[in-house]
Each structure stands twice: as C-alpha cells, then as structure tokens.
C-alpha cells in the first residue's frame, strides 16, 4: 500500500528507500501485450542484455511494479499499459525513491500509455532504452 507522501508499506511494514543500482546488478521486468508490435520489446530485451543486464517477464505488469518497489526487480518497462494496471504501482515505486516516468492520469485513463520505473541509476538507463526501442 502507498499513500502519496507517506511511503510504501508491505505487510504493515514501511519499505526502505531503493538503493542506487546499475543494470548489471539484477533483473529488469519487461512487459508486452498484443496491443503493440514485437519490434519494441525485442529491442528492449536486446538492449538490456547488451548492457550486461537480465530481463524478467511474469505476464503481470502490476505485480512487476510492486516487485520494483520492494527491490526484487531493478526496474520495469512496457510500451502500453492501462491506467488500472499501472498508476498504483507507479506510486508504490515513487514512494520508495524510485524513478517513475511522469504520466497524465487523465490521458492514461482514456488511452493508456508507456510505463517506465526504476531504482535510482537504473531509471535513466531504462528511459534511454525505452526511448530508443519504442520510437521505432
């Protein structure tokens, strides 16, 4: 659970702030759905691997965002998610000091959009990878 300005809680305990990291320090969640082509996700996975990282896919973007907040994943990227799958998870990550790409809640509710979150250090790397991959 997270409340803006009050941290992220798991099983009644407040989660500690995310520590700075690099792509080589763990796994990055990668989301994919049939709403988008495979070109972008192929580029994301290749870019993560080429940077010395490892990717993880569990078919639940919402759960992956919670894993980032808890430090189980270094970050997460997906070209398109619906608001109900991501806005709460983005708050979870932001409340533990992770980076979360700015979103318009209104735009996300109407049409969904790209989601990128990450631990300090990883977030900027994932933004660059996502910009490159999803612009194609």
Give a label for each model feature.
Residues 73-83:
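Active-site neighborhoods of divalent-metal-dependent phosphate/nucleic-acid chemistry enzymes
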């Amino acid at each position: 659970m997270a409340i803006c300005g009050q941290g992220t809680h798991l099983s009644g305990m407040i989660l500690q702030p995310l520590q700075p990291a690099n792509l080589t320090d763990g796994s990055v969640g990668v989301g994919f759905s049939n709403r988008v082509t495979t070109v972008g996700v192929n580029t994301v996975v290749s870019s993560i691997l080429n940077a010395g990282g490892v990717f993880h896919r569990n078919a639940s973007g919402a759960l992956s965002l919670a894993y980032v907040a808890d430090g189980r994943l270094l970050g997460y990227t997906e070209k398109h998610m619906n608001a109900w799958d991501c806005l709460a998870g983005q708050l979870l990550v932001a409340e533990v000091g992770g980076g979360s790409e700015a979103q318009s809640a209104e735009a996300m509710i109407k049409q969904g959009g790209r989601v990128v979150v990450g631990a300090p250090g990883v977030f900027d790397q994932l933004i660059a990878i996502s910009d490159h991959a999803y612009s194609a």
